[in-house]
Amino acid sequence: MSAAPLVRDVDRLDPAGVAAVLALLRAATAADGVRPLSEEAELRLQHGGPAGGRDVLATAADGALTGYARFEGGEGTGDAEAELVVAPGSRRRGVGRALLTRLEELAGDRPLRVWAHGDLPGSAELAQRHGYERARVLLQMRRELAGVDPEPRLRLPEGVQVRTFRSGTDEQAWLRTNARAFASHPEQGSWTAEDLRLREAEPWFDPAGFFLAWDGDRLLGSHWTKVHPPGDEGPEAVGEVYVLGIDPDAQGLGLGRALTDVGLAHLRRLGLRQVLLYVEEDNTAAVTLYERSGFTRHAVDVSWRRAR
């Protein structure tokens, strides 16, 4: 019988601790075929996050890292959120249970939501055993790029022009439009200048794949694409419809379709064979639209919630 894991949490990991967690994430990705943490959680692991966040570590008696969780305390009385991963060689040894127990202690009297990426059987079993219920479901959808026109003829409203993002110039306009486009979205609509800055500093950031639709000096919408390197979302590089948003006042002008075409054409010209996107399962209108555009369901992320 293995000894119970040792669990501790810190405000911020040192570089050696971050490196150890990143190695664990790579091992879990290779074993499960899905990244165990969201991009946001990985950024906060590496760069820190808002007040109330904690890095939670589980280790064996010999000090080996067996599990990790990222806890976000949130603000006010809202739900606390977390994501966790257990090392492939340490599963079904109480590590997930120990991490979850500490996350619940950190949440205190507030409800806790825990994201499970890939909706793997082990994560569902752990959540249900501890009284959690499915609260949100995020679909990953994919399509082939072979049928995409690499040089599409765009139908844009009169006076509207599409150009690529200019770092150091377009940030504030994009943040304002993004907040309006995603006013009802719990994560995307709350992006700050720091959130954008961190992504501009990432190795994958490429302004040549970040398209903005302007009417004079007014930003109407954007399509930000991303390229995942081999091993990130599969054995080959994969494109992503990273952020596609239209200002509510510009809805109905056909900009969503035009910007989608521009972004997919860009990814096709890069030689990529597949593109992915994420959409809420209960957003049936968007899911239907994407299915009509050739996307099919590929993977599922689940937010499990337990009321206190």
From Swiss-Prot:
Subunit structure: Monomer.
Family: Belongs to the acetyltransferase family. MshD subfamily.
Taxonomic classification: Bacteria, Bacillati, Actinomycetota, Actinomycetes, Geodermatophilales
Organism, as annotated: Geodermatophilus obscurus (strain ATCC 25078 / DSM 43160 / JCM 3152 / CCUG 61914 / KCC A-0152 / KCTC 9177 / NBRC 13315 / NRRL B-3577 / G-20)
Residue positions binding 1D-myo-inositol 2-(L-cysteinylamino)-2-deoxy-alpha-D-glucopyranoside: E39, E187, K226, E240, Y278
Record's protein name: Mycothiol acetyltransferase
Catalytic activity: 1D-myo-inositol 2-(L-cysteinylamino)-2-deoxy-alpha-D-glucopyranoside + acetyl-CoA = mycothiol + CoA + H(+)
Signal peptide: none
Gene: mshD
Top-level taxonomic group: Bacteria
